[in-house]
């Protein structure tokens, strides 16, 4: 049910944990054809806030429906909420820099939304804010927890992740995943190559040029936390791990990436080679959604969406605690059915 890579072990996950969802936006998501993490490019800026609202409330306030792809495939926040319903951990939303802020309580890192990486993603002032404040958050969480799970929501985040990995010296071109089964590799490559021109030599200035607020918020929270960390995400979390490694070469021994089989088995990406380069362990949930009653859920098995909002890590946490595949899929179907029945989802 869970596959282990590079020395990852599931036994460390059998303790109380807090779920941290770091949200933000990047104007890269407005580039047509780059992401399907929203019904239109403009709606991608609402996706992180709506994801956060749905995980906490079971409904969205920022938009009148949960985020969907242009073809109606639901957000992975649905999988996250279903998995966490069996555990009920503390859930904290962290705004690293979202264009639309959620209408729920959240912690603000005093960052800013990411701009177009082909010009300049973030100001140095905001980069420092995000890193310093997220480190402090991690330190405070250490007072209560020995384990945290960090998820992310930022449309076009795989593109900024690829730019970040390349800027830090990793062989990452064409190796990141996509929410679409048709990974727009040529467009991503073109955007990233343009972003990487005339890079400054200082690593922090490089991150300000091509990264995004979420990667910095995830990295900072991890750097401040004293216990074990499950980075719940796909190829984006290899970029977060790379940033962590820039600051503290010893930190990755306490960190594991928890993702989905759809990420590690993605033929159009190579998440495992990225994790190996960075030096981070990986766990993958083998959750099978082909038995779902709903086509929108079964679409995940065809390569749609794949990961996000901590879906893979949350499934791992549920499976480690004895929740069966069938039970988890029934819960996902139940939540999806409620959305369809209440007209909170247009399919």
UniProtKB/Swiss-Prot annotation:
Q: Which domain of life is it from?
A: Archaea
Which Pfam families would you find in this protein's record?
A: DBI_PRT
Q: Name one GO molecular function term.
A: nicotinate-nucleotide-dimethylbenzimidazole phosphoribosyltransferase activity
Q: What does the sequence similarity comment in the record state about its family?
A: Belongs to the UPF0284 family.
Q: What is this protein called?
A: UPF0284 protein M164_0030
This chain's source organism reads Saccharolobus islandicus (strain M.16.4 / Kamchatka #3) (Sulfolobus islandicus)
